[in-house]
Amino acid sequence: MAELEFEKPVVELRNKIRELKDYTKNSQMDFSEEIRILEEKLENLEEDIYGNLKVWDRVQIARHAERPTTLDYIEHLFTDFFECHGDRLFGDDAAIVGGIAKYKGMPVTVIGHQRGKDTKENIRRNFGMPHPEGYRKALRLMKQAEKFNRPIICFIDTKGAYPGKAAEERGQSEAIARNLFEMAGLTVPVICIVIGEGGSGGALGLGVGDYIHMLENSTYSVITPEGAAAILWKDAGKAKEAAEAMKITAADLKELGVIDEIIPEARGGAHRNVLKQSENIDLMIRKTFEQLNGISKDELIEKRYEKYMKIGQVSFSNASIWIK
Protein backbone atom coordinates (compact mmCIF):
# COMPACT_ATOMS: atom_id res chain seq x y z
CA MET A 1 0.00 0.00 0.00
CA ALA A 2 1.42 3.37 -1.05
CA GLU A 3 2.62 5.53 1.83
CA LEU A 4 1.93 9.22 2.16
CA GLU A 5 4.54 11.80 3.11
CA PHE A 6 3.36 12.28 6.70
CA GLU A 7 3.10 8.49 7.25
CA LYS A 8 6.81 7.74 6.78
CA PRO A 9 7.66 7.45 10.52
CA VAL A 10 4.75 5.01 10.97
CA VAL A 11 5.74 2.93 7.94
CA GLU A 12 9.38 2.78 9.04
CA LEU A 13 8.40 1.53 12.51
CA ARG A 14 5.98 -1.03 11.04
CA ASN A 15 8.74 -2.34 8.79
CA LYS A 16 11.12 -2.57 11.73
CA ILE A 17 8.58 -4.61 13.73
CA ARG A 18 7.93 -6.91 10.76
CA GLU A 19 11.66 -7.48 10.23
CA LEU A 20 12.12 -8.30 13.91
CA LYS A 21 9.22 -10.77 13.82
CA ASP A 22 10.62 -12.44 10.70
CA TYR A 23 14.06 -12.69 12.29
CA THR A 24 12.55 -14.23 15.44
CA LYS A 25 10.80 -16.93 13.38
CA ASN A 26 14.04 -17.92 11.66
CA SER A 27 16.25 -17.93 14.75
CA GLN A 28 16.27 -19.25 18.29
CA MET A 29 16.48 -15.79 19.83
CA ASP A 30 13.46 -14.33 21.62
CA PHE A 31 12.69 -10.70 20.84
CA SER A 32 9.09 -10.78 22.08
CA GLU A 33 9.70 -8.07 24.70
CA GLU A 34 11.40 -5.79 22.17
CA ILE A 35 8.53 -6.37 19.74
CA ARG A 36 5.98 -5.57 22.45
CA ILE A 37 7.73 -2.29 23.25
CA LEU A 38 7.92 -1.33 19.57
CA GLU A 39 4.25 -2.19 19.01
CA GLU A 40 3.31 -0.01 21.96
CA LYS A 41 5.43 2.76 20.49
CA LEU A 42 3.72 2.26 17.12
CA GLU A 43 0.27 2.56 18.69
CA ASN A 44 1.24 5.85 20.35
CA LEU A 45 2.85 7.14 17.15
CA GLU A 46 -0.23 6.31 15.05
CA GLU A 47 -2.48 7.98 17.60
CA ASP A 48 -0.30 11.08 17.56
CA ILE A 49 -0.05 11.34 13.75
CA TYR A 50 -3.54 10.27 12.70
CA GLY A 51 -5.18 12.04 15.61
CA ASN A 52 -3.62 15.37 14.66
CA LEU A 53 -3.88 15.46 10.88
CA LYS A 54 -3.24 18.79 9.19
CA VAL A 55 -5.41 19.99 6.33
CA TRP A 56 -2.79 19.06 3.74
CA ASP A 57 -2.55 15.57 5.23
CA ARG A 58 -6.28 15.13 4.66
CA VAL A 59 -5.91 16.39 1.09
CA GLN A 60 -3.33 13.67 0.49
CA ILE A 61 -5.60 11.01 2.00
CA ALA A 62 -8.54 12.19 -0.13
CA ARG A 63 -6.34 11.79 -3.22
CA HIS A 64 -4.84 8.43 -2.24
CA ALA A 65 -4.53 6.17 -5.28
CA GLU A 66 -6.08 3.27 -3.37
CA ARG A 67 -8.96 5.22 -1.84
CA PRO A 68 -12.29 3.41 -2.41
CA THR A 69 -14.32 4.62 -5.38
CA THR A 70 -18.02 4.75 -6.17
CA LEU A 71 -17.99 1.24 -7.65
CA ASP A 72 -16.24 -0.12 -4.54
CA TYR A 73 -19.02 1.22 -2.33
CA ILE A 74 -21.73 0.05 -4.72
CA GLU A 75 -20.34 -3.47 -4.41
CA HIS A 76 -20.50 -3.38 -0.60
CA LEU A 77 -23.68 -1.35 -0.03
CA PHE A 78 -26.14 -2.38 -2.73
CA THR A 79 -27.50 -5.49 -4.41
CA ASP A 80 -28.70 -6.13 -7.96
CA PHE A 81 -26.86 -3.10 -9.35
CA PHE A 82 -27.58 -2.58 -13.04
CA GLU A 83 -25.44 0.09 -14.68
CA CYS A 84 -27.07 2.40 -17.22
CA HIS A 85 -25.08 4.04 -20.00
CA GLY A 86 -25.28 7.13 -22.18
CA ASP A 87 -26.99 10.50 -22.11
CA ARG A 88 -29.12 9.86 -25.24
CA LEU A 89 -27.61 13.00 -26.76
CA PHE A 90 -23.91 12.41 -27.43
CA GLY A 91 -22.31 9.42 -25.74
CA ASP A 92 -21.40 7.58 -22.56
CA ASP A 93 -18.98 9.17 -20.09
CA ALA A 94 -17.06 6.64 -18.01
CA ALA A 95 -16.11 9.34 -15.47
CA ILE A 96 -19.65 9.06 -14.07
CA VAL A 97 -21.28 5.72 -13.31
CA GLY A 98 -24.90 5.21 -12.43
CA GLY A 99 -27.77 2.81 -12.46
CA ILE A 100 -30.52 1.16 -10.48
CA ALA A 101 -29.96 -1.07 -7.46
CA LYS A 102 -31.54 -2.24 -4.24
CA TYR A 103 -30.65 -0.90 -0.80
CA LYS A 104 -31.98 -3.18 1.96
CA GLY A 105 -34.53 -4.40 -0.59
CA MET A 106 -35.61 -0.86 -1.55
CA PRO A 107 -35.18 0.20 -5.22
CA VAL A 108 -32.81 3.18 -5.50
CA THR A 109 -30.83 5.03 -8.14
CA VAL A 110 -27.09 5.29 -7.49
CA ILE A 111 -24.84 7.78 -9.29
CA GLY A 112 -21.23 8.77 -8.71
CA HIS A 113 -17.96 10.03 -10.09
CA GLN A 114 -15.56 7.21 -10.93
CA ARG A 115 -11.77 7.37 -10.92
CA GLY A 116 -9.50 4.63 -12.19
CA LYS A 117 -7.34 2.30 -10.12
CA ASP A 118 -4.44 2.22 -12.59
CA THR A 119 -3.12 4.26 -15.51
CA LYS A 120 -5.15 2.45 -18.17
CA GLU A 121 -8.43 2.79 -16.26
CA ASN A 122 -7.69 6.39 -15.30
CA ILE A 123 -7.29 7.27 -18.97
CA ARG A 124 -10.57 5.52 -19.81
CA ARG A 125 -12.36 7.35 -17.00
CA ASN A 126 -10.54 10.64 -17.65
CA PHE A 127 -9.20 10.61 -14.07
CA GLY A 128 -12.74 11.06 -12.75
CA MET A 129 -13.26 14.40 -14.54
CA PRO A 130 -16.61 14.27 -16.37
CA HIS A 131 -17.57 15.71 -19.75
CA PRO A 132 -21.04 17.24 -20.30
CA GLU A 133 -22.43 13.87 -21.38
CA GLY A 134 -21.56 12.52 -17.93
CA TYR A 135 -23.71 15.12 -16.19
CA ARG A 136 -26.49 14.64 -18.74
CA LYS A 137 -26.38 10.90 -18.16
CA ALA A 138 -26.66 11.55 -14.43
CA LEU A 139 -29.64 13.86 -14.98
CA ARG A 140 -31.33 11.29 -17.20
CA LEU A 141 -31.05 8.75 -14.38
CA MET A 142 -32.31 11.26 -11.82
CA LYS A 143 -35.41 12.05 -13.88
CA GLN A 144 -35.96 8.33 -14.36
CA ALA A 145 -35.70 7.87 -10.58
CA GLU A 146 -38.25 10.64 -10.08
CA LYS A 147 -40.63 9.00 -12.57
CA PHE A 148 -40.50 5.67 -10.73
CA ASN A 149 -40.32 7.22 -7.24
CA ARG A 150 -36.85 5.89 -6.40
CA PRO A 151 -34.58 7.70 -3.89
CA ILE A 152 -31.25 8.89 -5.28
CA ILE A 153 -27.83 8.41 -3.69
CA CYS A 154 -24.90 10.37 -5.18
CA PHE A 155 -21.22 9.72 -4.47
CA ILE A 156 -18.97 12.71 -5.13
CA ASP A 157 -15.30 12.19 -5.98
CA THR A 158 -13.73 14.44 -8.61
CA LYS A 159 -11.05 17.09 -8.95
CA GLY A 160 -13.55 18.94 -11.14
CA ALA A 161 -15.38 18.84 -14.44
CA TYR A 162 -13.09 18.38 -17.44
CA PRO A 163 -12.04 21.83 -18.78
CA GLY A 164 -11.02 20.71 -22.27
CA LYS A 165 -12.02 22.34 -25.55
CA ALA A 166 -14.42 19.55 -26.60
CA ALA A 167 -16.18 19.63 -23.22
CA GLU A 168 -16.69 23.38 -23.48
CA GLU A 169 -17.98 23.07 -27.06
CA ARG A 170 -20.57 20.53 -25.90
CA GLY A 171 -21.80 22.84 -23.13
CA GLN A 172 -20.00 21.90 -19.92
CA SER A 173 -21.27 24.88 -17.93
CA GLU A 174 -24.85 24.42 -19.19
CA ALA A 175 -24.83 20.73 -18.26
CA ILE A 176 -23.72 21.46 -14.69
CA ALA A 177 -26.11 24.40 -14.31
CA ARG A 178 -28.98 22.27 -15.61
CA ASN A 179 -28.22 19.60 -13.01
CA LEU A 180 -28.22 22.17 -10.21
CA PHE A 181 -31.57 23.50 -11.38
CA GLU A 182 -33.20 20.10 -11.84
CA MET A 183 -31.82 18.52 -8.66
CA ALA A 184 -33.23 21.36 -6.60
CA GLY A 185 -36.73 20.42 -7.70
CA LEU A 186 -36.61 16.61 -7.66
CA THR A 187 -39.61 15.13 -5.85
CA VAL A 188 -37.68 12.14 -4.49
CA PRO A 189 -35.14 12.07 -1.62
CA VAL A 190 -31.55 12.85 -2.65
CA ILE A 191 -28.58 11.93 -0.45
CA CYS A 192 -25.11 13.17 -1.48
CA ILE A 193 -21.88 11.82 0.01
CA VAL A 194 -18.41 13.24 -0.67
CA ILE A 195 -16.11 10.19 -0.62
CA GLY A 196 -12.86 11.74 -1.89
CA GLU A 197 -12.25 15.09 -3.53
CA GLY A 198 -15.22 17.37 -4.09
CA GLY A 199 -13.88 19.77 -6.65
CA SER A 200 -15.73 22.88 -7.81
CA GLY A 201 -18.71 22.75 -10.19
CA GLY A 202 -17.71 19.24 -11.16
CA ALA A 203 -18.73 18.12 -7.69
CA LEU A 204 -21.80 20.36 -7.50
CA GLY A 205 -23.18 18.71 -10.64
CA LEU A 206 -24.02 15.74 -8.40
CA GLY A 207 -24.17 17.68 -5.15
CA VAL A 208 -27.62 19.19 -4.66
CA GLY A 209 -29.52 17.06 -2.16
CA ASP A 210 -31.62 16.90 0.97
CA TYR A 211 -28.60 15.78 3.00
CA ILE A 212 -24.93 16.31 2.19
CA HIS A 213 -22.46 14.12 4.08
CA MET A 214 -18.66 13.90 3.90
CA LEU A 215 -16.18 11.23 4.78
CA GLU A 216 -13.87 12.40 7.55
CA ASN A 217 -10.81 12.80 5.29
CA SER A 218 -12.55 14.01 2.15
CA THR A 219 -12.40 17.59 0.86
CA TYR A 220 -14.95 19.92 -0.75
CA SER A 221 -13.90 23.19 -2.35
CA VAL A 222 -14.42 25.67 -5.18
CA ILE A 223 -10.94 24.97 -6.56
CA THR A 224 -7.94 22.78 -5.80
CA PRO A 225 -5.40 24.16 -3.31
CA GLU A 226 -2.82 24.23 -6.12
CA GLY A 227 -5.19 26.23 -8.32
CA ALA A 228 -5.98 28.68 -5.54
CA ALA A 229 -2.28 29.16 -4.76
CA ALA A 230 -1.49 29.77 -8.43
CA ILE A 231 -4.20 32.44 -8.66
CA LEU A 232 -3.61 34.16 -5.31
CA TRP A 233 0.18 33.97 -5.04
CA LYS A 234 1.25 33.00 -8.56
CA ASP A 235 2.87 29.97 -6.96
CA ALA A 236 1.25 26.50 -6.94
CA GLY A 237 3.93 25.47 -4.45
CA LYS A 238 1.97 27.31 -1.75
CA ALA A 239 -0.85 24.76 -1.97
CA LYS A 240 -0.47 23.83 1.71
CA GLU A 241 -1.07 27.41 2.82
CA ALA A 242 -4.01 27.69 0.44
CA ALA A 243 -5.55 24.49 1.78
CA GLU A 244 -5.39 25.84 5.33
CA ALA A 245 -7.08 29.10 4.32
CA MET A 246 -9.82 27.60 2.13
CA LYS A 247 -11.77 25.69 4.85
CA ILE A 248 -12.12 22.56 2.73
CA THR A 249 -12.25 19.80 5.35
CA ALA A 250 -15.36 18.02 6.60
CA ALA A 251 -15.00 19.61 10.05
CA ASP A 252 -14.71 23.12 8.58
CA LEU A 253 -17.69 22.67 6.29
CA LYS A 254 -19.90 21.20 8.99
CA GLU A 255 -19.12 24.19 11.19
CA LEU A 256 -20.01 26.51 8.31
CA GLY A 257 -23.29 24.68 7.70
CA VAL A 258 -22.41 23.52 4.19
CA ILE A 259 -22.70 19.81 5.02
CA ASP A 260 -24.88 17.86 7.44
CA GLU A 261 -22.82 15.01 8.90
CA ILE A 262 -19.26 13.67 8.97
CA ILE A 263 -18.80 9.94 8.36
CA PRO A 264 -15.87 8.54 10.40
CA GLU A 265 -12.97 6.84 8.62
CA ALA A 266 -10.67 4.05 9.68
CA ARG A 267 -7.40 5.25 11.19
CA GLY A 268 -5.21 6.33 8.30
CA GLY A 269 -8.04 6.63 5.79
CA ALA A 270 -10.85 4.72 4.09
CA HIS A 271 -8.37 2.73 1.96
CA ARG A 272 -7.16 0.95 5.10
CA ASN A 273 -10.43 -0.94 5.51
CA VAL A 274 -12.97 -0.70 2.69
CA LEU A 275 -15.44 -3.07 4.38
CA LYS A 276 -15.44 -1.09 7.63
CA GLN A 277 -15.76 2.17 5.72
CA SER A 278 -18.73 0.78 3.81
CA GLU A 279 -20.36 -0.13 7.12
CA ASN A 280 -19.88 3.44 8.36
CA ILE A 281 -21.49 4.83 5.20
CA ASP A 282 -24.29 2.27 5.50
CA LEU A 283 -25.12 3.50 9.00
CA MET A 284 -25.31 7.09 7.78
CA ILE A 285 -27.50 6.22 4.78
CA ARG A 286 -29.90 4.28 7.00
CA LYS A 287 -30.05 7.15 9.51
CA THR A 288 -30.70 9.65 6.72
CA PHE A 289 -33.49 7.61 5.17
CA GLU A 290 -35.13 7.41 8.60
CA GLN A 291 -35.03 11.22 8.80
CA LEU A 292 -36.54 11.53 5.31
CA ASN A 293 -39.24 8.95 5.89
CA GLY A 294 -42.79 10.29 5.77
CA ILE A 295 -41.91 13.69 4.28
CA SER A 296 -44.27 14.73 1.48
CA LYS A 297 -42.96 15.74 -1.95
CA ASP A 298 -43.87 19.39 -1.44
CA GLU A 299 -42.22 19.51 1.97
CA LEU A 300 -39.14 17.75 0.59
CA ILE A 301 -38.61 20.42 -2.06
CA GLU A 302 -39.36 23.23 0.39
CA LYS A 303 -36.84 21.94 2.95
CA ARG A 304 -34.22 21.46 0.25
CA TYR A 305 -34.75 25.03 -0.95
CA GLU A 306 -34.48 26.39 2.60
CA LYS A 307 -31.30 24.37 3.17
CA TYR A 308 -29.49 26.02 0.28
CA MET A 309 -30.84 29.49 0.92
CA LYS A 310 -29.22 29.41 4.37
CA ILE A 311 -25.74 28.68 3.02
CA GLY A 312 -23.68 31.84 2.79
CA GLN A 313 -26.02 34.04 4.81
CA VAL A 314 -24.10 36.61 6.81
CA SER A 315 -24.88 38.83 9.77
CA PHE A 316 -23.07 42.03 10.65
CA SER A 317 -22.12 42.54 14.29
CA ASN A 318 -19.41 44.89 15.56
CA ALA A 319 -18.02 45.17 12.03
CA SER A 320 -17.49 41.40 11.91
CA ILE A 321 -19.02 38.99 9.42
CA TRP A 322 -20.05 35.53 10.54
CA ILE A 323 -21.08 32.75 8.19
CA LYS A 324 -24.19 30.99 9.45
Swiss-Prot record:
Pfam families: ACCA
GO molecular function, one term: ATP binding
EC number(s) recorded for this UniProt protein: 2.1.3.15
Root EC class: transferase
Compartments in which it is found: Cytoplasm
Entry's Gene Ontology cellular component terms: acetyl-CoA carboxylase complex
Keywords assigned: ATP-binding, Cytoplasm, Fatty acid biosynthesis, Fatty acid metabolism, Lipid biosynthesis, Lipid metabolism, Nucleotide-binding, Transferase
UniProt family annotation: Belongs to the AccA family.
Function: Component of the acetyl coenzyme A carboxylase (ACC) complex. First, biotin carboxylase catalyzes the carboxylation of biotin on its carrier protein (BCCP) and then the CO(2) group is transferred by the carboxyltransferase to acetyl-CoA to form malonyl-CoA.
Quaternary assembly: Acetyl-CoA carboxylase is a heterohexamer composed of biotin carboxyl carrier protein (AccB), biotin carboxylase (AccC) and two subunits each of ACCase subunit alpha (AccA) and ACCase subunit beta (AccD).
Official protein name in the record: Acetyl-coenzyme A carboxylase carboxyl transferase subunit alpha
Organism ancestry: Bacteria, Bacillati, Bacillota, Bacilli, Bacillales
